[in-house]
Amino acid sequence: MQVTAPRTVLLLLSAALALTETWAGSHSMKYFYTAVSRPGRGEPRFISVGYVDDTQFVWFDSDAASPREEPRAPWIEQEGPEYWDRETQISKTNAQTYRESLRNLRGYYNQSEAGSHIIQRMYGCDMGPDGRLLRGYEQYAYDGKDYIALNQDLSSWTAADTAAQITQRKWEAARWAEQLRAYLEGTCVEWLRRYLENGKETLQRADPPKTHVTHHPISDHEATLRCWALGFYPAEITLTWQRDGEDQTQDTELVETRPAGDRTFQKWAAVVVPSGEEQRYTCHVQHEGLPKPLTLRWEPSSQSTIPIVGIVAGLAVLAVVVIGAVVAAVMCRRKSSGGKGGSYSQAASSDSAQGSDVSLTA
């Protein structure tokens, strides 16, 4: 797959993080699949990435010299050879099936063989504080557009167009939603609990944000106040600005949460204020790593470039870390849902973290 520019990577990864953030006390496990055809340059490329909460833990790339499911987090390395053999077999089977699906969907849309096309899948589960399924996901996209998705009732589908309706009919005939529901309510949650226990020092930690407010003059009459939150984990955080105690939500510029490249996250929120009225504005920060919410004001004597330097350094690290490893995964969230097709064959045992995963063809 072609390497994406750093700015694009950041935008795509931000979109993915918006997906992985869940309710307080809950956790998630999601897999992102991407298959890209490349006429004249060999077989389509297939990439699979797994996440627990905001942490990537497995990776598979069909273009590797010896394609294998690979660990991407220290706590997953304790899994035995059977685990890696099983997950590798699932990914290899999916790679072949998604290649067939690309050919079939090209026919559905009456497209020529000359162009490159992409199928993306995101599926997984959110687990609530009680250890049960909170929400399940099964979404597909084709060429960057919604294709088909499992509804929240986990028993019906939403097809984006007439081509996707063909897939929907096949899946309904195969009772695919029932199998998915069993996986989401059972195997997915069970593996998520296991991963959370094995990686609890990393996955269940709560690093509080380092916070600061900076001041940036716009003119003689206005200035921007920017509230920074750096170095926090997990990714879920709330930044709000108030003027004399009243929320300024509509007037706040808020960026998506961004990875810092060191397994922590960054975010900022900004407001434009009249010069001389800066002290009427307060930034409020809520995060599970804080014993109580923070309230900050701009302190003229403490103006510092440290937060800006921290952001720049973090983004530089991020560009190096994720360009090769995350692009394929996060693109799936950006497109939201999409497409493959309908027949299925068992690829591995139900003990697989990816599920009693099936190979789907259009």
UniProtKB/Swiss-Prot annotation:
Region entry Disordered, spans: 336-362
Region (Alpha-3): 207-298
Every Ig-like C1-type domain range: 209-295
Membrane topology qualifier: Single-pass type I membrane protein
Ranges of compositional bias, category Low complexity: 343-362
Organism: Pan troglodytes
Compartment(s): Membrane
InterPro entries assigned to the protein according to its UniProt record, in alphabetical order: Ig-like_dom, Ig-like_dom_sf, Ig-like_fold, Ig/MHC_CS, Ig_C1-set, MHC_class-I_related, MHC_I-like_Ag-recog, MHC_I-like_Ag-recog_sf
Keyword list, A-Z: Disulfide bond, Glycoprotein, Immunity, Membrane, MHC I, Phosphoprotein, Signal, Transmembrane, Transmembrane helix
Quaternary structure annotation from Swiss-Prot or TrEMBL: Heterodimer of an alpha chain and a beta chain (beta-2-microglobulin).
Keyword hit for rRNA-binding: no
Entry protein name: Patr class I histocompatibility antigen, A-5 alpha chain
Positions carrying Phosphotyrosine: 344
Similarity comment: Belongs to the MHC class I family.
CDD domains: IgC1_MHC_Ia_HLA-B
Residues in the Cytoplasmic compartment per record: 333-362
Function: Involved in the presentation of foreign antigens to the immune system.
Gene Ontology CC: one annotated term: lumenal side of endoplasmic reticulum membrane
Residues linked to a glycan: 110
Modified residues (Phosphoserine): 343, 345, 349-350, 352, 356, 359
Transmembrane segments: 309-332
Connecting peptide: annotated span: 299-308
Protein's GO biological process: antigen processing and presentation of endogenous peptide antigen via MHC class I via ER pathway, TAP-independent; antigen processing and presentation of endogenous peptide antigen via MHC class Ib; immune response; positive regulation of T cell mediated cytotoxicity
N-terminal signal peptide: 1-24
One MF annotation (Gene Ontology) recorded for this entry: peptide antigen binding
All ranges on the Extracellular side of the membrane: 25-308
Cysteine pairings via disulfide bonds: 125-188, 227-283
Lineage: Eukaryota, Metazoa, Chordata, Craniata, Vertebrata
